[in-house]
From Swiss-Prot:
Name of the protein in question: Hypocretin neuropeptide precursor
Its job: Neuropeptides that play a significant role in the regulation of food intake and sleep-wakefulness, possibly by coordinating the complex behavioral and physiologic responses of these complementary homeostatic functions. A broader role in the homeostatic regulation of energy metabolism, autonomic function, hormonal balance and the regulation of body fluids, is also suggested. A modulation effect on luteinizing hormone-releasing hormone (LHRH) secretion also suggests a more minor contribution to the regulation of reproductive function.
Gene Ontology BP terms: behavioral fear response; eating behavior; excitatory postsynaptic potential; feeding behavior; negative regulation of DNA replication; negative regulation of potassium ion transport; negative regulation of transmission of nerve impulse; neuropeptide signaling pathway
Family: Belongs to the orexin family.
Lineage: Eukaryota, Metazoa, Chordata, Craniata, Vertebrata
Positions annotated as propeptide: 97-130
Cell location: Rough endoplasmic reticulum; Cytoplasmic vesicle; Synapse
Length: 130
């Protein structure tokens, strides 16, 4: 079975190259999109922007973005939330250190009293009482 031969005129090929080549060359010369002001000044969360425009495997980062859970909030994160939230900022900031220390205490034993629980209950808590 013989297929009819089709010859493409050089004018059509030239026209196609003239239409497609300049945009392709221009797209190579264009720099990456500039970083938004909020990301440059670190005033907002730019995790998605960094995933899209940063180095590395973008697909893996984007696919796992929703599955990631942030680690335990540090003092810096809690201080930031206290300053940005409504309410009594001074009370929250003044008690923040005490709450951080309280989180480090071990949980009491389940069931009846264990020897460490009674020793902890009888030991005085830190700080002077005036």
């Amino acid at each position: 079975m013989n297929l009819p031969s089709t010859k493409v005129p050089w004018a059509a090929v030239t026209l196609l190259l003239l239409l497609l080549l300049p945009p392709a060359l221009l797209s190579l010369g264009v720099d990456a999109q500039p970083l938004p002001d909020c990301c440059r000044q670190k005033t907002c969360s730019c995790r998605l922007y960094e995933l899209l425009h940063g180095a590395g495997n973008h697909a893996a980062g984007i696919l796992t973005l929703g599955k990631r859970r942030p680690g335990p909030p540090g003092l810096q994160g809690r201080l930031q939330r206290l300053l940005q939230a409504n309410g009594n900022h001074a009370a929250g900031i003044l008690t923040m250190g005490r709450r951080a220390g309280a989180e480090l205490e071990p949980y009491p034993c389940p069931g009846r009293r264990c020897p460490t629980a009674t020793a902890t209950a009888l030991a005085p808590r830190g700080g002077s009482r005036v």
